[in-house]
UniProtKB/Swiss-Prot annotation:
Molecular function terms, GO-annotated: chromatin binding; DNA binding; DNA-binding transcription factor activity, RNA polymerase II-specific
Full protein name: Pre-B-cell leukemia transcription factor 2
UniProt source species: Xenopus tropicalis
Chain spans, region PBC-A: 49-128
Stretches of the chain forming a coiled coil according to its record: none
Gene Ontology CC terms, in alphabetical order: nucleus; transcription regulator complex
Span list, region Disordered: 1-43, 319-341, 353-422
Location relative to the cell: Nucleus
SMART domains: HOX (SM00389)
Length: 422
């Protein structure tokens, strides 16, 4: 009877004389999905609490972070979470892979590398700077003791620039490698929690290198500027000009005025003059080209100088007696009086007469001819190395019959620019 009463109470049916204990609230059934009341706090957390935990991640200590990371890796739902992240990445990662393109090498960086390599600053060999300096010194044509000292100073300073460049480049490479290694380790560590492919790690390394390349370009740019300043100070063609020695100038002027009818020395004569003056053949050619131009433009200015060298040469030959007939066709030694073969006994004096408008007294000319002797002009005409030229009043040399052995430019009577070819 009691059992039947309990069933009817559960169904909400009252029995007369037996009130329902507990009131109406006792008739409300419990939901099927709700856990029992004795199971403790609910398992789900509020979204606000989750966001608050995310915001406080940066304030955690390393020990707390390692503990949470270990708890996440050991969680039974971690593989499922990782697979969901992989699916999301697979859907969104296609557009990222399609946009990946290899960027070409920066042309400015390539030019800087080529310049540093050409100057001997870059390259595997530590002695490249000295080799480049020696090549530059040879190209400049300087072989005198002063130039050798100057080029030694240039090599020392270039070596200093090279050492500074390699030291700074080593620091740059070390910093770049350290940062790249740190990022790679960080990405590998994160790949345990979120999906990161090896290609993505390589892409990130490329981005880091491009960021660091601006530092490398600045280093190479400053090094190239330092090398260019050094070259302009020591080896550039526009640097301060250095005149020849007084002895070399005397030898060149004496040769020029003694061959005034044909001031175009052959290659053999240039080599001999270069040895006597301690300069190069190229410098001899440049000097004669410039001298011819200046002489044509300022004949009156060089009149006195030409007269002095004419008398000096004649006196030197007169003192030598008739031995001038056997003299060589090129200058003798650097310490001698500088006797040269004239193009003819009359050429030099007649040239002065036609150019300057001032004639020598006949007695002076005859005395000089008598002093030099009758066999002098004959021997000279037999051993002429240059073809005679007619010197016009405007300063141009008109070429006569040019032998095949003479190397002189073909020019007109008033040509000036063609002289520089020799």
């Amino acid at each position: 009877m009691d059992e039947q009463g309990r069933l009817m109470q559960a169904r909400g049916v009252g029995i007369p004389g037996h009130p329902i204990h507990g009131g109406p609230q006792t008739l409300t059934p419990h939901p099927m999905h709700e856990p029992p009341a004795d199971n403790g706090e609910p398992r789900k957390q509020d979204i606000g609490d989750i966001l608050q935990q995310i915001m406080t991640i940066t304030d955690q200590s390393l020990d707390e972070a390692q503990a949470k990371k270990h708890a996440l890796n050991c969680h039974r739902m971690k593989p499922a979470l990782f697979s969901v992240l992989c699916e999301i990445k697979e859907k969104t990662g296609l557009s990222i892979r399609n946009t990946q393109e290899e960027e070409p090498v920066d042309p400015q960086l390539m030019r800087l590398d080529n310049m540093l390599l050409a100057e001997g600053v870059a390259g595997p060999e530590k002695g490249g700077g000295s080799a480049a300096a020696a090549a530059a010194a040879a190209a400049s044509g300087g072989v005198s003791p002063d130039n050798s000292i100057e080029h030694s100073d240039y090599r020392n300073k270039l070596s200093q620039i090279r050492q500074i460049y390699h030291a700074e480049l080593e620091k740059y490479e070390q910093a770049c490698n350290e940062f790249t290694t740190h990022v790679m380790n960080l990405l590998r560590e994160q790949s345990r929690t979120r999906p990161i492919s090896p290609k993505e790690i390589e892409r990130m390394v490329g981005i880091i290198h491009r960021k660091f390349s601006s530092i490398q370009m600045q280093l190479k740019q400053s090094t190239c500027e330092a090398v260019m300043i050094l070259r302009s100070r020591f080896l550039d063609a526009r640097r301060k000009r250095r005149n020849f020695s007084k002895q070399a100038t005397e030898v060149l002027n004496e040769y020029f005025y003694s061959h005034l009818s044909n001031p175009y020395p052959s290659e053999e004569a240039k080599e001999e003059l270069a040895k006597k003056c301690g300069i190069t053949v190229s410098q001899v050619s440049n000097w004669f080209g410039n001298k011819r131009i200046r002489y044509k433009k300022n004949i009156g200015k060089f009149q006195e100088e030409a007269n002095i060298y004419a008398v000096k040469t004649a006196v030197s030959v007169a003192q030598g007696g008739h031995s001038g007939a056997n003299s060589p066709t090129t200058p003798t030694s650097a310490g001698s009086g500088g006797s040269f073969n004239l193009s003819g006994s009359n050429d030099m004096f007649m040239a002065m007469q036609g150019l300057n408008g001032d004639s020598y007294p006949p007695s002076q000319v005859e005395s000089l001819r008598h002093t030099m002797g009758p066999g002098y002009s004959d021997s000279l005409s037999a051993n002429q190395m240059y073809s005679p030229r007619e010197i016009r009043a405007n300063g141009g040399w008109q070429e006569a019959v040019t032998p095949s052995s003479v190397t002189s430019p073909t020019e007109g009577p008033g040509s000036v620019h063609s002289d520089t070819s020799n």
